[in-house]
Amino acid sequence: MAELGKIEKPEASSFKSKRKFYVIPTLPFEELALEFHIDNAKIERFWGEVREKISYFVSTYGNTSFVYVEGIEESEKAGIEYFEKFGKDSNHYKLIKTLADSGATIKGIDKNESLKFSKLLFEEYSKSFLPEIKELHQDFFGKDIDFDKWREYLVKRIQETQDEMNKYTSKIINELPDNSNGVLIITEGRPVDYPQGMDVFMIRPPAFDEIAKNIRDIQGR
């Protein structure tokens, strides 16, 4: 898997007949912007750099057939209007619109029930560290309640749920037709098994690390 910060022109002949997949690891920057005081200019720079890289690959290998998006139900018919929430002048929106206008189909990779359950598990795990939650549980269940065991159980269920989501997503990705290209927008760190024989390019421009550091610094205060 190639990780692209700077673009170095690959030998097109070595990739010509394979399926090509451009993976964009991201975080919900737009949603986190207010909470973590993320400058919108940094978000725009991130998506602008992504647009440049995708544009390069399109010019080298041809148009993209599918744009796979995390957070959209697999059976849902999603259009460009889904991305209007980011603003029509945003690089995020312009990236998707350019791909869609060139014939790419926007496709979800998740099941709603899996997304909801995964979110519930993560929230429950995070809350288990709050003293107020521990006290509330002890008031009802007694002082002997074992929060470490509870967290171990939650971690186990989180892993099981992620494994199920991984298999489901990998199955959808594997349906990408031969000799075609796809884009995947997915949360950084989410596991995905890519099919053998597929050329996978990880697009992670410098702006990503800058924003991620911004978030970590604020969380560590």
Where are the language model's segments positioned?
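Compositional signal for N-terminal targeting/processing segments
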Residues: M1-R221
